[in-house]
């Protein structure tokens, strides 16, 4: 609809056609009609207010006893969904933690395979004796980040040999101190 068509539509509401007669009431009639109009407007307003639906108080009101009863039923229903970790089969866990992978990377790209084994929760022993020092440092930095991300640990167990363990493997003792003591005793 165009702008002019809308204008014509609305102007028809407010304009009185020439054919209609308009009576101008006397002042006396206006004074008598004014209180009647006010009274009818007030009645209309009151009826409009009465027509607004009232909220049912009983629908929203609950006692604390009902609320507690609902919460206890809710917690009872949800307790069936809880699985305790003690019920996990110990054989599967021991098989995962009992496997150790040995790696001797030749290039930095071999580090991805080591990280994959760590993500699969397997301990890895990494021998960096056959790689240049710069690449060895990059590999250790990468593996340190991987071990940190999975919550594991990395330990030096020999010259350029590192043990990387995931969170399900615990290493007791330390070989590094013993190796350093042995090296100093040969001097």
UniProtKB/Swiss-Prot annotation:
Region entry Disordered: which residue ranges? 21-97
Q: Which GO terms describe its cellular component?
A: cytoplasm
Function, please? Answer: Cell division protein that is part of the divisome complex and is recruited early to the Z-ring. Probably stimulates Z-ring formation, perhaps through the cross-linking of FtsZ protofilaments. Its function overlaps with FtsA.
Which InterPro entries is this protein grouped with?
Cell_div_SepF, Cell_div_SepF/SepF-rel, SepF-like_sf
Location(s), subcellular: Cytoplasm
One Pfam entry for this protein is SepF
Q: What is this protein called?
A: Cell division protein SepF
Q: What is its main location?
A: cytoplasm
Source organism superkingdom: Bacteria
Subunit structure, interactors included: Homodimer. Interacts with FtsZ.
């Amino acid at each position: 609809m165009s702008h002019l068509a809308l204008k014509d539509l609305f102007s028809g509401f407010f304009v009185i056609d020439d054919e209609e007669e308009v009576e101008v009431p006397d002042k006396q009639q206006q004074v008598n009609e004014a209180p009647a109009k006010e009274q009818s407007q007030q009645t209309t307003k009151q009826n409009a207010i009465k027509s607004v639906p009232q909220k049912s108080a009983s629908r929203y009101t609950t006692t604390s006893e009902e609320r507690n009863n609902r919460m206890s039923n809710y917690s009872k229903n949800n307790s069936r969904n809880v699985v305790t970790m003690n019920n996990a089969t110990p054989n599967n866990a021991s098989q995962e933690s009992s496997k150790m992978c040995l790696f001797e990377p030749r290039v930095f790209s071999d580090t991805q395979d080591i990280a994959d084994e760590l993500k699969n929760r397997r301990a890895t022993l990494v021998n960096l004796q056959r790689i240049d020092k710069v690449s060895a440092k990059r590999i250790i930095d990468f593996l340190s980040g991987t071990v940190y991300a999975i919550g594991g640990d990395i330990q030096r167990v020999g010259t350029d040999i590192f043990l990387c363990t995931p969170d399900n493997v615990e290493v007791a003792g330390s070989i590094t101190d013993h190796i350093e003591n042995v090296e100093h005793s040969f001097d």
